[in-house]
Amino acid sequence: MALTGMTSSPPADPAENGKFDVSEVDLDIASRGLKAMGHPLRLKILCILAGAEEVSVQDLVAQVGTSQSNISQHLSILRDKRILASRKDANKVYYRIGDPKILQLMGIMRDAFCTVPSY
């Protein structure tokens, strides 16, 4: 896999030429985003959100099984990396996955790393 500097052309299709042409800026953004997603608790939050349109902080606390302050810290990290979007309604804050590409990535990670039970 060859990595090159910044290019002005659209990203190459690796299936066509076996290469990924990625800028240093894009590599940095991707690395930081994947690092944020890589924490087990944040990954659990993302899995919950991937299965719902949006979820309140209180519901995430109940489903994840940790304190609200801990959940809020992890949500803040994911929001800062623009992985999550939020909205406030009265005294509740709701979170959702902010980009459909993240949902696609979650599906790919599930297919690659998770055991799917056979029925």
Residue ranges with predicted function:
Residues D21-S67, V93-K101:
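N-terminal helix-turn-helix DNA-binding core of bacterial DNA-binding proteins
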Residues V57, R87, L105-M106:
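Short, hydrophobic secondary-structure boundary micro-motifs
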Residues A62, Q73, D80:
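Alpha-helical residues within the helix-turn-helix
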Residues A2-I29, G51, D99-Y119:
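Amphipathic alpha-helical dimerization/coiled-coil segments
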Residues A36, S72, I77:
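Short glycine/proline-centered loop/turn elements that form peptide/ligand docking sites
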